[in-house]
C-alpha cells in the first residue's frame, strides 16, 4: 500500500495580534468562520486521507460553537490536545494521527488555521512536487513547503529603528503552509528541538536542524497569513466571491 497523506491543522492559539474577543481562526471572513476555509480545502482533496484539527483542551467542538450545518460535508477529526505553543500542538497532533492509523512513513501536511486562502490546487501542487522530489528513490523524498519568493527590498533596522543595512533578497523565500513531511521524521525533529530548547517557528525549521533541506514549492500570495486586524479586509476581498469558490478554485 502506498504511503498516505494526512492534514494537521493546529488551532489552539489565541491570535492576540489580530485583535477581537475570540481567537482569529474563529472570526468571520466572507460569511464563514476563518477555519472553515482550510477544512474545506483539505476536504475537497481526494489525496488527503484524513484531517486532524487540534484544539485546546478547554475549547469546544466547532459544531457546538457555530452550529453543525456550517461544517456539514467537511471531512475532519477533532483532537482536544493542543499545547501552549504551535510546536507542542503539532507534536500532540502527530500522536493523534497515529491513533487514526497514520504510520511513520505516511505524509503529514501541517497548515496554519489563519491561512484561509488555501485551495485544493495548491495542496495538489505541493503533494506532486514533494512526492516526485527524488525519482530515483521516492522513499528518500525529504518533504517540502509552499513558499513565495520575496519581491520587496528588505531593510535591517538598527537599535534606533533606522535602516542599518539592506538585505539582498536574492534566494529569499517567504515560508507558507502547508508544510509536508513524513510523520516519523517530523515527530523526531520536533522532539529533538524540544529536548534542545531550540525555538522553531515552523515545521521546516525543525527539519532543518536534522541537516535536511526541504523543497521550496511555489505557493501564492493568496495564501497569506491573517495576522493583524487590517488583514481581515484583504481576506474578505480574496474570499468574498463565496465559500464554494474559495474551496474549489485554484486561483
UniProtKB/Swiss-Prot annotation:
Pfam families with a match to the protein in the record: IspD
One GO process term, biological-process aspect: isopentenyl diphosphate biosynthetic process, methylerythritol 4-phosphate pathway
GO molecular function per UniProt: 2-C-methyl-D-erythritol 4-phosphate cytidylyltransferase activity
Residues the record marks as site: Transition state stabilizer: 17, 24
Principal EC category: transferase
Domain of life: Bacteria
UniProt key word Transmembrane: no
Site (Positions MEP for the nucleophilic attack): residue numbering on this chain: 169, 225
Reactions it catalyzes: 2-C-methyl-D-erythritol 4-phosphate + CTP + H(+) = 4-CDP-2-C-methyl-D-erythritol + diphosphate
EC number, UniProt record: 2.7.7.60
Pathway(s) it belongs to: Isoprenoid biosynthesis; isopentenyl diphosphate biosynthesis via DXP pathway; isopentenyl diphosphate from 1-deoxy-D-xylulose 5-phosphate: step 2/6
Keywords noted in UniProt: Isoprene biosynthesis, Nucleotidyltransferase, Transferase
Function: Catalyzes the formation of 4-diphosphocytidyl-2-C-methyl-D-erythritol from CTP and 2-C-methyl-D-erythritol 4-phosphate (MEP).
Family: Belongs to the IspD/TarI cytidylyltransferase family. IspD subfamily.
Name assigned to this protein: 2-C-methyl-D-erythritol 4-phosphate cytidylyltransferase
Organism: Cupriavidus pinatubonensis (strain JMP 134 / LMG 1197) (Cupriavidus necator (strain JMP 134))
Gene designation per UniProt: ispD
Amino acid at each position: 500500500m502506498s504511503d498516505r497523506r494526512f492534514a494537521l491543522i493546529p488551532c489552539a492559539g489565541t491570535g492576540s495580534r489580530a485583535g477581537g474577543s475570540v481567537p482569529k481562526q474563529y472570526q468571520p471572513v466572507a460569511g464563514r468562520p476563518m477555519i472553515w476555509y482550510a477544512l474545506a480545502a483539505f476536504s475537497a482533496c481526494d489525496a488527503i486521507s484524513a484531517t486532524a484539527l487540534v484544539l485546546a483542551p478547554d475549547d469546544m467542538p466547532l459544531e457546538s460553537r457555530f452550529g453543525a450545518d456550517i461544517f456539514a460535508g467537511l471531512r475532519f477529526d477533532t483532537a482536544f490536545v493542543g499545547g501552549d505553543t504551535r510546536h507542542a500542538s503539532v507534536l500532540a497532533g502527530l500522536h493523534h494521527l497515529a491513533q487514526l492509523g497514520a504510520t511513520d512513513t505516511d505524509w503529514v501536511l501541517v497548515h496554519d488555521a489563519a491561512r484561509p486562502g488555501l485551495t485544493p490546487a495548491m495542496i495538489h501542487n505541493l503533494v506532486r512536487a514533494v512526492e516526485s522530489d527524488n525519482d530515483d528513490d521516492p522513499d528518500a523524498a525529504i518533504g517540502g513547503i509552499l513558499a513565495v519568493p520575496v519581491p520587496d527590498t528588505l531593510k535591517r533596522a538598527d537599535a534606533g529603528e533606522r535602516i542599518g543595512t539592506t538585505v539582498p533578497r536574492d534566494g529569499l523565500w517567504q515560508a507558507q503552509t502547508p508544510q509536508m513531511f513524513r510523520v516519523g521524521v517530523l515527530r523526531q525533529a520536533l522532539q529533538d528541538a524540544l529536548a534542545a530548547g531550540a525555538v522553531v517557528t515552523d515545521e521546516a525549521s525543525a527539519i532543518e536542524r536534522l541537516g535536511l533541506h526541504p523543497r521550496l514549492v511555489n505557493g501564492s500570495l493568496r495564501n497569506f497569513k491573517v495576522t493583524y486586524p487590517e488583514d481581515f479586509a484583504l481576506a474578505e476581498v480574496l474570499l468574498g466571491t463565496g465559500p464554494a469558490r474559495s474551496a474549489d478554485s485554484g486561483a
